[in-house]
Amino acid sequence: MLIPRKVKHRKQHHPRQRGIASGGTSVNFGDYGIQALEHAYVTNRQIESARIAINRHIKRGGKVWINIFPDRPLTKKPAETRMGSGKGSPEWWVANVKPGRVLFELSYPNEAIARAALTRAIHKLPIKARIITREEQF
């Protein structure tokens, strides 16, 4: 699982999700990429599930890059707890994804298999996304 080794503060505020991604919007390492089309918090489990889906489909001969990292903790209070008495304990680690951000990159010689693998990964993610290539970037 992807989690930070050490953080300065255990709990953070939840900012509003607005704006578009300013960096990380192009395919730099691989030939194909998954680009987000909307705002979302992507958890470390969803990132890992998408990575496994890609690797199982391409088997061997390709390389996968993960361009996001879950560095923000989300907290949750236990079930059937009264209001008040502070903020809940950290439950998940999430990556704050903005529209335009490239989440995964893939290098693979066969385009049809690469697109099928990335489509499987998109189904594991909680956002609308599209597949882009190194040539067709906006």
UniProtKB/Swiss-Prot annotation:
Keywords: Ribonucleoprotein, Ribosomal protein, RNA-binding, rRNA-binding, tRNA-binding
Listed GO MF terms: rRNA binding; structural constituent of ribosome; tRNA binding
PROSITE patterns on file: RIBOSOMAL_L16_1, RIBOSOMAL_L16_2
A Gene Ontology biological process term: translation
CDD domains: Ribosomal_L16_L10e
Region (Disordered): 1-24
GO cellular component: cytosolic large ribosomal subunit
Compositional bias per record (Basic residues), positions renumbered to this chain: 1-17
Main function: Binds 23S rRNA and is also seen to make contacts with the A and possibly P site tRNAs.
Similarity remark: Belongs to the universal ribosomal protein uL16 family.
Subunit description: Part of the 50S ribosomal subunit.
Name of the protein this chain belongs to: Large ribosomal subunit protein uL16
Species name: Mycobacterium marinum (strain ATCC BAA-535 / M)
Primary gene name: rplP
